[in-house]
Amino acid sequence: MEKRKDTKTTIAKASDAQNKSWYVIDATGKTLGRLSSEVAKILRGKHKVTYTPHIAMGDGVIVINAEKVHLTGAKKGQKIYRYYTGYISGMREIPFENMLAKKPSYIIEHAIKGMMPKTRLGKRQLKSLRILKGDCYKTFEAQKPILLDV
């Protein structure tokens, strides 16, 4: 951490961002947007005192029980995920309920991705995100994840 001579602002170096913590967040009964914004803050590193916008200072996040996330109001029946296959008339639309049954991790990943910067740094920070269906995260025991209540 280096301090500039003319200001009191401290600017972190890339070497300061090496010690990364991992957090486990349970998505059971959580609202999609509120959960996603908290995860995005942790991935970017905004929860740290030494946050520097141009350095990947964020921590890793493991989201479990992705299939138990919910939406408020009538959005459960109205929300549609769209993508284009690349072919003529290749626009596909999948309702939220079908996507939740088919690929629940995509729902959370899509929401978090929209809250991250659309730059190389944002893509690098997204690599620290793991979304799991179910509550078993034994494969990540080596990272010594901390259970976080959001």
Swiss-Prot record:
**What interactions and quaternary structure are annotated?**
Part of the 50S ribosomal subunit.
- Describe the task this protein carries out: This protein is one of the early assembly proteins of the 50S ribosomal subunit, although it is not seen to bind rRNA by itself. It is important during the early stages of 50S assembly.
Q: Which InterPro entries match?
A: Ribosomal_uL13, Ribosomal_uL13_bac-type, Ribosomal_uL13_sf
Name a Pfam family for this protein. Answer: Ribosomal_L13
Nuclease recorded as keyword: no
Which SUPFAM superfamilies does this chain map to?
Ribosomal protein L13
- Organism encoding this protein: Chlamydia caviae (strain ATCC VR-813 / DSM 19441 / 03DC25 / GPIC)
Q: Which UniProt keywords apply?
A: Ribonucleoprotein, Ribosomal protein
Name the family.
Belongs to the universal ribosomal protein uL13 family.
Q: What is this protein called?
A: Large ribosomal subunit protein uL13
Q: Which GO terms describe its cellular component?
A: cytosolic large ribosomal subunit
List, in alphabetical order, the GO biological process terms annotated in this UniProt record: negative regulation of translation; translation
Q: Molecular function (GO) terms listed?
A: mRNA binding; structural constituent of ribosome
